[in-house]
């Protein structure tokens, strides 16, 4: 699965990949400059409130070396960015 990762520089420049965005919780926490537990909490709340559905926004992928992990769609990344309050999230919201 080819997947893109959004990057946000310190000065607020957002780089959007040309391939579909699918990011892990760790990649989102790095991009938005928050702890992983903040991302996990936001994902859990989004699913609990039925704002988005897991079947539409999460995929389970396995690397060639056998390591597997969950990745989340652009729709989830955007929803999380509107829940968190960091300068990186604000830059991403302006970009969207």
Regions found by a protein language model. Give the residues of each.
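Short Lys/Arg-enriched helix C-cap and helix-to-coil transition segments
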Residues: 51-65
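Positively charged, aromatic-accented nucleic-acid-binding surfaces
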Residues: 1-34, 61-96
